[in-house]
Amino acid sequence: MAIFIESEIWPNMILNIKKKSIPLLLLNARITKKSFNKWNSISSLSKNLFGNFDVTFPQNNETNKYLKILGAKKIKTIGNLKFSENEIKKPNTFSKKLNTFFKSKKIWCASSTHKSEEKICAIAHKKLKQKYKNLLTIIIPRHVHRIKDITEEIKDLELNYCIHSSKDKINKNTEIYLVDTYGETKSFFRICKTVFLGGSIISHGGQNPLESIRLGCNIIHGPNVRNFKEIYDLLKLKGLSKKINNSNQLIKTLDISFNKKGNSLKKINQIKKIGSKILDNTYREVEYYIKKK
């Protein structure tokens, strides 16, 4: 048996495997509108390729629709396997001084932000600071080379800030903490109760919320989450995320979140339950082809 994952479609390999009568499976298939248009422009090839899979398992309904058009014969929508991923518990790598500072603050995080979204978050911070004197806003921009532009916007709002790579400059008056490094986002999620996921107020398509929700965070996002629509729809259904459209709505939602006695473990377990069901159902399908061979 040969298993291909998500969008990893290798034409020559698929055709050669099929010649040997080896079962072909496409797990957690993901086809975006952009990639669908490319495959559909060479429909004779795509129908030959996708038609050779014994079964395909799309991770969402959009992919299901595209697979049908592209010639897949047997399609089973079970769900997105990414729900089944587990977070490994491990301590953060912050210095003792930084950990002490964070523990003294009421923290929320704005992650993967794009141009204009940082200003919206900073305005929200300034308003909320009137009520929460120890408030700290952590901003993790999607592109760290924009840090200089972001600091100018923060200066214009007369807010005190510190840049993560300059840890020694942090002090009790720091209001905005700007992260200019890669690979530490999870560490910041672990110390935050609430996370705003960027690329969603602007028309970028949003960011995958599963990493933050698996760590028990309250999720806030803008209206533009088309890249992960079905995940956000499910989170909304479970009451695990909140959509906002502007700074005023962000302020209101954060205020509610700060005073909400939420159970992060409950959120984590909800996602685990969804993931376990998807994983179990997928395993049973794969097992059928293992035994069949």
Residue ranges and their predicted role:
Residues M1-K293:
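Nucleotide-activated sugar donor-binding and catalytic core shared by glycosyltransferases
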